[in-house]
Every structure is written in structure tokens, then in C-alpha cells.
Amino acid sequence: MDIGRAVRFLRKRQGWTQQQLADFSHTSKSNISNLENGNQGYSPAILEYLAKAFNCSVSQIFLLAENMDNEGNLLKDWQHMPIDVLFIQLPQEVQCQLKHLIFTLIDTKK
């Protein structure tokens, strides 16, 4: 499992540069680069900042990492992946739209 590959995958899905992710997660660009390339470990604090930047949980980042191969590609057919892994792959604006749609559907069922 490589957290760095998952971080790179999520960053690119958001269309962010390493500098933008560094700014969002209160760290330096070099730390992001080192993490993505496997040259540096990660602390619980940086994982929390990254999760907040990606609008997900730390456990979702780990889930994504578990479902990636050595090249950063998803291993499983998307139909068999946990919904959390699928959801965090979406850009944040799409995540917000889906959340709104889900809440609207829930409200109409009341």
C-alpha cells in the first residue's frame, strides 16, 4: 500500500498542483513531492490535513491506496469497489452536487 500514490491520484483528480495541495494542507511543496514519490513518510497530522483538503477521511485515503497498483492505477473493477473509494475520486464540486442530490432524495422520502 502506497499512500503517496493515492495522494497523487487524488491531487490530480482535483486538478491541483503540488503547490496548491501544499497550501491547502499546511505543508511545503517539497513535502508533498517527497510523499507522492515515496521518499518521505507521513505523520497523522499531515494525513489529517490532506484528508481535509480532499474533503474525505484518512481511512478513505487508506482505502484508495489499498485499491491501487504500483503504477497508481485502480486495481478493481469500479463496480466492485467500496462506494467511499469511488466517491473520493470525484472532483469536489461533483461530490457537493451528489451530496445535495442525495439529501434532496432523502428529504422527498420523509
From Swiss-Prot:
Residues 7-61 form the HTH cro/C1-type domain. Transmembrane segments: none annotated. This is Competence pilus inhibition repressor. The keyword Transcription regulation applies. The lineage of its organism: Bacteria, Pseudomonadati, Pseudomonadota, Gammaproteobacteria, Moraxellales. The gene is cpiR. PANTHER family: DNA-BIDING PHAGE PROTEIN, TRACRIPTIONAL REGULATORY PROTEIN-RELATED-RELATED. Signal peptide: none annotated. Gene3D superfamilies: lambda repressor-like DNA-binding domains. Residues 18-37 bind DNA. Represses transcription of the PilB-specific inhibitory protein CpiA. The keyword Transcription applies. Keywords: DNA-binding, Repressor, Transcription, Transcription regulation. InterPro entries: Cro/C1-type_HTH, Lambda_DNA-bd_dom_sf. GO terms for molecular function: DNA binding. Disruption phenotype: Deletion of the gene results in a 100-fold reduction in transformation. It comes from the Bacteria.
